Amino acid sequence: MSAALSRPPAPDPEPLPATVPDSHCHLDMMVGPVGPVLAQAARSGISRVVTVGCDVPSSQWAADCAAEHGSVIAAVAIHPNETAAAAAGPGGRDGVLAQIADLAAQPRVRAVGETGLDYYRDSAPPEVQRDWFRAHIDIAKAAGKALMIHDRDAHDDVLAILAQRGAPEHVIFHCFSGDEAMARRCAEAGYVLSFAGTLTFASAPGLRAAAAAVPPELLLVETDAPFLAPVPARGKLNAPALAAHTLRALAAARGIDAAAMCEIVSRNAERVFGAW
């Protein structure tokens, strides 16, 4: 079991003054059934959830979960760390990508992701990751869906590939990890920045500066649950409900109240993903 999954649950946050979505989590990795997780989230004002796949089985699970639960939509892809293994598995590269393309066409699947580049880990060679990233960009454009990016220690290459390949209408940098300069580069291209619990960490003043630097229409919040629990729940099991803490941190970084931030984030999510 992952260390994150062995942690104790966090108490419910104070409910938000209005509802917002958790724009990125992994419901398939949560402990226990989905229903109670969604109920806890709703009590905290997190009324909708985007559950995200990292390989074919978890992407299929995400699509099925979204079809079953009205408050859930899905994103499907091969995570960059899984690309080499996927290419070596049944169906090979083209067969796996065809399965992702089929899932991306489903109406409750609203994004292709998480895809991108991860140069922090060496699970897949960089050239393999770049090839799969380009293929996912093509799938997102063909399906008319948003592109949800995993970018770790790869800012320049991610931006270069998006520019060279041609980005879809909506691009989301999941768990944005760049500084203010990177945020401004993304904003110039119209890319959306989704902030996770890392925004609340004492060690992340650069993230808060980035969150304050971009236009409000380019902001989302997420949990990446069950990972990256925000302050004051660090060390606990993350869950979609805890996006309420990150929403308040985002509001504070921008110098506005939580109600105004809720309205902004909810409106942005519907523009990027469509209504649900």
List where the protein language model places each region.
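Mid-domain alpha/beta scaffold segments of enzyme catalytic cores
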Residues: M1-W276
